[in-house]
């Protein structure tokens, strides 16, 4: 596996990462097998979008043994509400969703944070100049 410095972060990440959203279609055993194969192949970065809660639990259990060797990219700005993905900038919803991500992943940190679904310059301005960044 080849690795590159990720911008100015100091993180050396694999050129290939695991986009975990599609793991929603798989049970724990399949998630574990996929994540183990990625780990064995040298993949060390996992993008965990705020998707269906159970898949985040499965991912957390699957990476637990090697958590410190994975770079987790988590997303904020979306939540899971009533079985449906919901885009939101409401911190009263965003913060508990992020805390749930940490809990389900079995960790107290993520390595990289992404603001989910910034679709226009107006979205960007509202995020940068509003309470979302604070």
In which residue ranges do the predicted regions lie?
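Glycine/proline-rich, positively charged
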Residues: 40, 86-134
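Structural motif corresponding to the early beta-alpha repeats
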Residues: 51, 65-92, 116-119
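Generic anion/oxyanion-binding catalytic loop in active/binding sites
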Residues: 20, 48, 83, 99-102
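N-terminal binding-site loop/beta-alpha segment at the start of enzyme catalytic domains
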Residues: 1-74
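Glycine/Thr-rich phosphate-binding loops of Rossmann-like dinucleotide-binding domains
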Residues: 26, 56, 82, 120-123
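Short, surface-exposed alpha-helical recognition segments that flank or form part
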Residues: 26, 47-50, 85, 89, ...
């Amino acid at each position: 596996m080849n690795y590159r410095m990720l911008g100015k972060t100091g993180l050396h990440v694999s050129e290939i990462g695991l986009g975990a959203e599609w793991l929603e279609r798989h049970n724990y055993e399949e998630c574990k097998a996929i994540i183990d194969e990625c780990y064995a192949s040298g993949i060390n970065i996992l993008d965990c979008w705020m998707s269906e809660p159970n898949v985040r639990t499965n991912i957390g259990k699957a990476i637990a043994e090697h958590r410190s060797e994975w770079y987790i990219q988590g997303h904020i700005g979306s939540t899971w509400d009533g079985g449906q993905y919901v885009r939101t900038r409401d911190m009263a919803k965003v913060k508990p969703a992020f805390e749930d991500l940490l809990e389900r992943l079995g960790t107290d940190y993520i390595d990289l944070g992404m603001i989910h679904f910034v679709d226009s310059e107006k979205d960007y301005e509202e995020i940068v100049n509003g309470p979302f960044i604070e």
